[in-house]
Amino acid sequence: MMASYPEPEDAAGALLAPETGRTVKEPEGPPPSPGKGGGGGGGTAPEKPDPAQKPPYSYVALIAMAIRESAEKRLTLSGIYQYIIAKFPFYEKNKKGWQNSIRHNLSLNECFIKVPREGGGERKGNYWTLDPACEDMFEKGNYRRRRRMKRPFRPPPAHFQPGKGLFGAGGAAGGCGVAGAGADGYGYLAPPKYLQSGFLNNSWPLPQPPSPMPYASCQMAAAAAAAAAAAAAAGPGSPGAAAVVKGLAGPAASYGPYTRVQSMALPPGVVNSYNGLGGPPAAPPPPPHPHPHPHAHHLHAAAAPPPAPPHHGAAAPPPGQLSPASPATAAPPAPAPTSAPGLQFACARQPELAMMHCSYWDHDSKTGALHSRLDL
């Protein structure tokens, strides 16, 4: 009787289980997922994942998985939530933060397109679908490995394009004298141009400090003072003395506070007392002009010789002078005429004008009075 040998496969099984007589078969792999987007089984999720373990998929992969396994290849936001919770129980127990991440990825990722609902806006919520250009964004259907997608080129906005200003084409704001577009076309990157070259050439000069008195005016004032001293030394009745003293109020000395008194229309007595020269009242001088330069009639009036002074005790003093015998009975000086309103005395020692002249002063006193008048 011949012995029979089992087949190689049965022999291998007999070695593993000799007593039972049953062969042990190799374990089979897990059945493929019923989903349509498996693509080889590499990217499919397990049937019964561990609820305590977070799935190893990104939020973009979860959204793409939910959309691909839907019947219409599109889902609303609430439909995506329901699919993720049903597929992965981990997200059902941990609802903190992941729903916001799903919304952000739908809005910011270019692979997802929003499709409005049919029938207007009566029902809330829009559909989300995949961009046909991003169908193969996962390598061989593996949701754990995502390909690097090349983003399509998009032209920059109008205000960033070269050759255009910040406020319009051609840099229109640059010609208005403000911070406009520079040579590179980007107005906000160019250095500000607050002043154009044409404006700088035609700009107004800056205010300068006032200049001091000209040197010529000082020389003329000094020459007039020397001439007045020489005329006073010649004699009190000399016609040149009155002309020189009255001529001190010319344009060179018209800016002084004390020499300007002579250009005003004062009573004859006050003028004669101030000058230290005696004599009868003379005709009042013409009113002063608003401009400082002299005219011909001014020079003729200044050069006219005054009348001869009275002798001592021959006649009563004129009404503006005081005699030693009756100092209290002298008439006060007449007020200045009101024909030139706005004119005021610039001399601070005006009350002493009537006391500066005395008929008993000698020649030296009059010379000293003239010097004190010039030094004021």
UniProtKB/Swiss-Prot annotation:
There is a cross-link at residue 25 (Glycyl lysine isopeptide (Lys-Gly) (interchain with G-Cter in SUMO)). Signal peptide: none annotated. Induction: In granulosa-like cells, up-regulated at transcript and protein levels under oxidative stress and heat-shock conditions. Down-regulated by SIRT1. Residues 54-148 bind DNA. Disulfide bonds: none annotated. Changing residue 103 to C: In BPES; nuclear and cytoplasmic aggregation; normal transactivation activity. Changing residue 98 to G: In BPES; nuclear and cytoplasmic aggregation; impaired transactivation activity. It is found in: Nucleus. It is linked to Blepharophimosis, ptosis, and epicanthus inversus syndrome: A disorder characterized by eyelid dysplasia, small palpebral fissures, drooping eyelids and a skin fold curving in the mediolateral direction, inferior to the inner canthus. In type I BPSE (BPES1) eyelid abnormalities are associated with female infertility. Affected females show an ovarian deficit due to primary amenorrhea or to premature ovarian failure (POF). In type II BPSE (BPES2) affected individuals show only the eyelid defects. Interacts with ESR1. Interacts with SMAD3. Interacts with DDX20. Interacts with UBE2I/UBC9. This is Forkhead box protein L2. It comes from Homo sapiens (Human).
